[in-house]
Amino acid sequence: MSFASDCKDEASTIKDMPGHCKMASLEAMLRLNSEIVRTNGHFIITFLSANSHVAVYFMRLIKDLYDAQMELLTKEATKFLKKKTYEVVINSQCETIINDMNLFLNESPNHLDYESRECCKKSYLRGAFLARGSVNDPARSDYHLEIATRNNIEAIYIQRLMNSFDLNAKISKRRNDIIIYIKEIASITDFLRIIGVSQMVFKLEELQIQREFKNDLNRKVNSEIANGFKTLDAANQQLANIQCLEYNYPLEKMDPKILLIMKVRKDHPDSSFKELLEILNNDYGENITKSG
């Protein structure tokens, strides 16, 4: 499972919402990833997702708000369809849903109602992310979270919602899609917190602590080799970071090299980074380079 899928799985578990927040999430999902067709004089709405939890979440919203008849279809992966896909087909109440949300129009008066409530803004962003959002694995250094749409008015609206939370969201074009994206790790963390995925926020923050610890160690090692002095304040900061990791993060999931560095630092709290390098090399056979 990818980090983005895990985020969507957690967001799909959120149930305790008032009706107006459910409407906000549902409208976002319909606007970004649904298709409306007319068959034998009746409308049918379909919603597609590669995530089963998202499909079930969508069905729950429809059931709670409209008690409509639905069916869930599964499409297996093929060479043309890269992932297994879940299709929700709404067979009743479609005209009511379409009229309530003005889905045949490029813009909806409901948008103004959502903006008047912070809870609805968060719910709309949650629905948009579930429908067509993605986020890079935080283990990578190229931080990126995005929501895609094919409607320019919708893109501007989503950007406005995101930036009402100071996320510095920007818009770009990619083939047939308009992309609303954020790049800063702090903004990505805030966005995930806004849509309610607290467990994934915790995981993201722990990975950040690990990366900062390792990067800080490498910087200090290089500084010690170049300048030949030891900084006690830096060592104390390293010990504080180690204590934070040991208290908050499952150590069995950490890189063994990081665990070894943490142990050596705790065993030698007053040693310079140059001295730590020698201990790691002589006692443990670990050669730490500039790249770690």
Which residue ranges define each predicted feature?
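Extended mid-to-C-terminal alpha-helical interaction segments
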Residues: 196-290
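Sequence-level preference for short, compositionally simple segments enriched
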Residues: 1-43, 50-54, 72-82, 106, ...
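DNA-contacting interfaces and partner/effector-binding or oligomerization modules
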Residues: 49, 53-56, 60-207
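Short charge-dense sequence patches
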Residues: 1-15, 103-114, 143-144, 208-213, ...
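Generic amphipathic alpha-helical segments used as scaffolds and interaction surfaces in large
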Residues: 45, 49, 115, 145-149, ...
